[in-house]
């Protein structure tokens, strides 16, 4: 699946935006379909985050933080059903505020996974856009 991304402009500086991307008490406030979000230890490269999503009867994901550079960006990776997903956030200063870009890249390793990607790609793109717009609303609320 080709990667896709979405950007939002927020009227807050990167130092105020960045904590909302991974912190346990903040992510559930703007992420749809999220039942549980647990960070195992201090945030940083190698930290594991467990997400339980309410979609498809409930999906548990074990994500690993693979890049962590406050307040400029972070990345996570997880694998589910033969699909490896990397999500990257870039936070750039933009005037008095910030531009936040999230890029999602998924690679399938088997036939079944390759067949699933076209089915879920549209839903993932919509979710990414809606969640980032919700983040903007929460931050500027």
For each predicted feature, which ranges?
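Hydrophobic-ligand-binding modules of eukaryotic lipid transfer/binding families
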Residues: 1-8, 129, 133, 141
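Short, hydrophobic/aromatic-rich segments at coil-to-beta transitions
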Residues: 42-50, 68-77
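Generic structural detector for well-ordered beta-strands
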Residues: 7-11, 38, 52, 64, ...
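Short, surface-exposed coil-to-beta transition loops
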Residues: 3-5, 58-63, 84-88
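Hydrophobic ligand-binding cavity/cleft-lining segments
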Residues: 1-40
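Beta-strand/loop substructures that line and gate deep hydrophobic ligand-binding cavities in soluble
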Residues: 77-130, 135
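A short, structured loop/turn motif at beta-sheet edges
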Residues: 11-15, 42, 66-71, 90-99, ...
